[in-house]
Amino acid sequence: MINETAYLLGSNRSCIRELFEYGRQRAQEVGAQNVYDYSLGNPSIPAPPEVNAAIRQLLEDTDSLQLHGYTTAVGDLPAREAIAQDLNARFSAGVRPEDLFITCGAAPGLTAVCKALTFPGAKILAFAPYFPEYKPFVEAAGAQFGVVEADVPAFQICRSTLEAVLTPDVAAVIVNSPNNPSGVVYSRQTLTDLADLLTRKGEEFGHPIYIISDEPYRELAYDGVEVPFLPLIYPHTLVCYSYSKSLSLPGERIGYVYVPQSAADSAKVYAAVAGAARAMGHVCAPSLLQKVIARCASVRPDLEAYDRNRRTLYEGLAAMGYEVAKPEGAFYLFVKAPGGDAMAFSEKAKKKDLLLVPGNDFGCPGYFRICYCVSHAMIQKSLPVFRQLLAE
């Protein structure tokens, strides 16, 4: 006998991974230069030089046993001190090292936080469009996954739509800004309205409704747009952060959970996060990477290449007549599928070796996602294909 839920998760790849694997196969058949693969959000700019320098210096100067040995489960103190110092310098947030739990990227942090906040019969909501893996994360934690219908075409948060689905069994809502897949950044007004609503409903229900703020794209914002730090707007916010995108380290798996003192029962929540991580098999985040973050927590990415790609694609597609949500952050565009059927449009594009992820798994069936963390040359070469598809 096996676990049927686990079997289904393992045997059915996500639409993103399936398209990515197809792209790799097609690249072998027709040449990588002839495949326009916009499927996967894999950073295309190198890690900052400070990161590579830190790795080299650590390998040369640090005793091997110390460098590769176990750390504490919550993470090395120097790493947590560096993260707290960086957050306080930027946001005056009052972060303490003991409020931080170092994780193997954002995904296990999200799962641990969901588990920590789940009570019998609990529901955790996400705003469409949302990252598809939220559903298995929430369900693995033992909660029910609920979706708040998308606010199209702005893709902000519609207060009335959320209020209609807020019930006493809602433990938390997941907020992802800058957003994957839309590239939209939630405005300060949007987040203030959200905080006001959750405060009022929490008082009505007799328990706080937490926000789980998923922030892997926090540093990826353009045109000077503000990315508000949610714990300063809503006290019951838990932050899940990853350095995968900001430092181009997706394969190294390093991030953190921040449980602010302002959150209800913060000490218990922190302990519950630690316990949930333990039950998931967490021992510690990679020791070498923790030491890198201790030196590089304040390093920022060079966004010039992403911004150039963003402008080229957004302006090019909009000029052709595509309806596109203006991308202010991350490295995604979310485009309305001509004809309204994203699956059919993506299949048609696939026949031209243009790989676009339909929005069905993101909770928005009529849209498709473009990841523009690719070469600028590929973008320029693919634009005529987008024009052909629109004309057909």
Task: Name the predicted role of every residue range.
Residues 62:
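Conserved AdoMet
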Residues 1-19, 27-59, 74, 78, ...:
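PLP-dependent class I/II
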Residues 66-67:
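Pre-Walker A segment
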